[in-house]
């Protein structure tokens, strides 16, 4: 907690102990191992010795968890804490039904959702801070097993009000040109609201805009796709977003006020499960994956 928070105050609060207790513990630990673990600046920083200690501590913690999982599996005790990394919007769409179905079969397993960016999920997985991620992998990652979940597609969403305001009677011909050219240049006068580049929708959106060859008028950037979707509905700009988000969250009445532009194969990608390769694979991870696959096909 201290290495992550880089603050005695924040780490002590997270651990539900006093700052003095934590400070005394670290000082005693440093005395025992004969090395200084932290540079006590603001924020705190691990020394080289601290980085070594943390690496071994995380490895030991991971081995202890694996041992407990294997013992539970041998004794057929389905219990424990399953930590899952997933993007916030994807979690909102997928997890309620998946977790409900999973906990019917495994009522004594607690699920903790770590809702964060795709890149942060990968880092936490490699650091053994989470057991399973649900994300798009752009490349193979050493030490990580990947398994296909489902295919996702980004679309471009523009409100009819915004199209009428910018293009008037020409809006249908503009959209027809976009479809024929498979290029967004005809929309060069349209404002955009974009996810940040670290997110899938933000990355794909920027690739399409760069290919179109014009400098887009980006009105808003955000990490929250649902905020951007609401802005697009209000006519603030065109928005790149996952098609599944529209289908699962918007009413037919709202969809009728929007124009959805499909962008072809370049806007499609695969969502996968990812979990660290271990000497022993916790059975509960496989069980969760199985339930999720069954649920998505319903």
Region spans (language model):
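Short helix-boundary/capping micro-motifs
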Residues: 1-16, 43
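N-terminal winged-helix
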Residues: 19-20, 69, 75-106, 110-123
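A short LG(V/I)-centered, amphipathic sequence patch enriched
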Residues: 30-48
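Alpha-helical linker/hinge and terminal dimerization helices associated
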Residues: 32-33, 53-75, 137, 292
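Short beta-strand-centered segments that line the small-molecule binding cleft or hinge
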Residues: 98-101, 119-169
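Hydrophobic hinge/microswitch elements
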Residues: 118, 126, 136, 198-259
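Beta-alpha-beta core module
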Residues: 141-148, 152, 185, 226-278
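Secondary-structure junction motif
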Residues: 164-167, 171-212, 281-290
């Amino acid at each position: 907690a201290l290495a992550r928070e880089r603050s005695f105050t924040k780490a002590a609060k997270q651990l539900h102990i006093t700052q003095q207790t934590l400070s005394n513990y670290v000082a005693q630990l440093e005395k025992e191992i004969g090395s200084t673990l932290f540079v006590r600046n603001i924020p705190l920083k691990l020394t080289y010795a601290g980085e070594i200690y943390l690496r071994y501590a995380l490895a030991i913690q991971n081995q202890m968890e694996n041992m407990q999982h294997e013992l539970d599996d041998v004794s057929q005790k389905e219990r424990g804490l399953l930590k899952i990394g997933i993007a916030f919007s994807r979690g909102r769409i997928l997890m309620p039904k998946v977790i409900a179905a999973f906990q019917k079969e495994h009522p004594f397993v607690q699920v903790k959702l770590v809702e964060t960016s795709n890149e942060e999920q990968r880092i936490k997985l490699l650091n053994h801070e989470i057991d399973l991620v649900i994300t798009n992998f752009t490349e193979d990652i050493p030490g990580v097993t990947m398994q296909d979940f489902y295919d996702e597609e980004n679309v471009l969403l523009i409100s009819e009000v915004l199209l009428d305001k910018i293009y008037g009677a020409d809006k249908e011909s503009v959209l027809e040109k976009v479809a024929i050219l498979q290029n967004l240049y005809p929309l060069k006068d349209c404002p955009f609201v974009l996810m940040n580049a670290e997110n899938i929708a933000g990355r794909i959106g920027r690739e399409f805009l760069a290919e179109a060859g014009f400098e887009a008028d980006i009105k808003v950037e955000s990490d929250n796709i649902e905020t951007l979707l609401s802005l697009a509905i209000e006519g603030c700009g065109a928005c790149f977003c996952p098609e599944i988000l529209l289908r699962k969250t918007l009413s037919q009445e709202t969809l009728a006020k929007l124009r959805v532009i499909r962008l072809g194969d370049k806007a499609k990608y695969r969502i996968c499960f990812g979990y660290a390769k271990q000497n022993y694979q916790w059975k509960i991870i496989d069980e969760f994956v199985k339930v999720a696959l069954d649920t998505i096909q319903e």
